Amino acid sequence: MSSFLETKRSPQVVVGVTGSIAAHKAVDLVSFLVQRDCAVRVVMTADALRFVTEVPFKTLSRNPVVKCLYDTDEDWVPQHISLADWADVVVIAPATANTIAKIACGIADNALTCLALAMRPETGLLIAPAMNGRMWSHDATVENVRILNCRGVRMIGPAEGLQACGYSGKGRMSPVEEVGAQVIEMLRERNLA
């Protein structure tokens, strides 16, 4: 018999959104995760805000959206630190070549990259790249992905297909259902889903 005091908390996921034409897909990812009883917080880069506003993320997650390193809540703890402590899994979808490079090099110049650097070792990081195929296959990006893989970061995609620039090939963000399923799998590995 379980007591009413024994409650299991929802898995906690931070969704990072970067400045890609695929940023609108992150809205569906947040919805996917919320529908599976995940508590979701969203961190957007300044360039992400050029593609999609914070409103759908705030509405679907029922949480404020972090847009700036200096966004603060009522608490004294900086947002990137409190979110790093809070998250069970961080998923960056879409992830640009720029953000991938920054995380690989330890550059922490916005709320999302600071969060990535401040994550607890047991927190899972999943990256869903989205960029032009030439950018994806460039030696610098290949090396940055190798570095992140060696650190235990998981990558999903990119997928093949027609890209916003008109080229066809590898570079599209993986389908939302696949990204979401990988997040759920990472939570299961941590006995949280």
Segments and roles (model prediction):
Residues 1-127, 133-193:
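A cross-family phosphate/adenosyl-ligand binding-site feature
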